[in-house]
Amino acid sequence: SRAPGGCPWDAEQTHESLAPYLVEEAHEVLDAIAGGDRGHLAEELGDILLQVVFHARVAEEAGESAFDIDTVAGLLVDKLVRRHPHVFADGDASTPAEVEAAWESIKAVEKAGVGGDDYRADLLHGIPTSLPGGLAADKVLARVRRRGLTPDPDAVARVERARAALAAAESEVRAALEGLQR
């Protein structure tokens, strides 16, 4: 608890100091999914929820523009309603592919209002700079396919070579870590 008399470690945390824990917890959720243990998954999802609540509390205590857990939940509800007109309004989407296409279209309109009219043209727009390179490459290449674009083959080849190098480096790091256990 961050309340007076609560945990001193909790009390000194900031969004920045908590960021690595959020990333770590997300990876633990992925491991739990891959492991197929639903009890472990539930536990790890609880840890993600703790991160959300913790960040909201930090913001609330800092007086950051009335940002608290209610704000976070309200923004989520608003987004879900906006992006599901086939559920909450008179939109029509009867297949998962139609739902995904509608979601992307609505998201593009939202982002264009925030970031300018070039949202659809900018393949990197909205991709977090902190997203690992391999995942960023996957997202950009998926956008290219969805938009029916024909990218420069040399650029695609460079991306693929870089992804292969990343995978090799990741394998090397994992092998080195295994060596620490001996």
Locate predicted features.
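Flexible "arm" and connector segments at domain edges
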Residues: 1-44, 50-182
